[in-house]
Structure formats: C-alpha cells, structure tokens
Amino acid sequence: MRFWLAFFVSLFVVCAPAAAKSKKKNEFKDPRDKQTYRTVKVAGLEWMGDNLNYKTAGSFCYKDEDDQCMVYGRLYTWDAAKKACPAGFRLPTHADFESLWTAAGADFNAGYLLKADYGWSGDTNGNDTLKFSAMPAGNRFDDETYGNMAKFAFFWSGDDSSEGVAPGNARVWYLTSKSMAFGYMSKPKNFGFSVRCVR
C-alpha cells in the first residue's frame, strides 16, 4: 500500500510542472496591465487568440461601456493600434493576414475556420478550427458613434501605403455575418477597430 501511495505521489510531482508549463505555453500575460491572452500558432506565426484590451489613448470600449471591453477588447484608431501591442508583439502586416487566410483555406469559406463558434448574428458562427476565435466586436466611426456589433469583426493591419489604400486610410481585414469570407478593405485611420497582435 505504501509503495502505491509513494508511486502516485511521485507521479503527481513529476507530472504537475509539465501541465503548468503546457498551460502557460498557449498564453501571454501582458506585463503592462497583467491581462492574459490566449495565443495560437498559425502558418509559423504566433497570434493573440483574443482581441487586445490594453487601455491607451485612442482606444475605446464599444458604446463607451467598460463591460464590452471585457468581452470584445478595445477598439483602436490606427495610430493607437500601431503602438498598442506589448513588447515582442506587433501589429500584423497585410502579408501576415494573407498567411492567415491561406491557412484557413484561401477561399470564400475561410471565415468559417476563423470565426468564434458563438456571438455572430443569424446562423453565421464559425467552427473556430484555427482557434483564432474572431468575435464580431463592431467598430467606432469617426463621428464617435458605434455600430456593427454582432455583424462585423474588423482588424487593423500595419499597411497604409499599399496599392489600393487611399490617403488617410489604412488596410483593414474583416469578417462579416453576411458570408464566410475573410477579406480586406481601406478605411479611415480615425475609425476604431479591433487589434490582434502577432509575433
């Protein structure tokens, strides 16, 4: 009896640190405000699996309600987004998002693999195969109003000088409740959109 007790105690001691290490491996704790984010590896890049929620100038909660930030993260102007990621992470480039799109199948159903499996209006949730868990956080307009909650997820890229990007705009990748596509557009830099940091 004492042998088996000693065996199980030894097994627990050996296995427990490994379990803790595994848990931390897929998480990142922001030293600036102690918030923890899931991380996922896709196509050789490590993405945050949650929208950034670091409070800084030029960032907002949907409809200025703090509770929304706890679910959807903050909405950032492009200038704020460029500076918001913690050390070691950065705002994704257009090429980074293209790699994500390719990993999701590079077709009109890519959004199905990227969307969270809850929260989207209508019957348009994803299956979250890649664990990117895109949430429909909506956006802040330049007149300080808000819209598109449950209908759109917008993510800033770091590109503002690419072909097809108008002066004063930057490239935004988006998912919509209208389809399972994952695409991009050009939007004014003073709009508020979500941020996913990458490294």
Regions flagged by a language model, labelled:
Residues C15-A20:
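Sec/Tat signal peptide C-region and signal peptidase I cleavage site
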Residues M1-W4:
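Positively charged n-region of N-terminal signal peptides that target proteins for export
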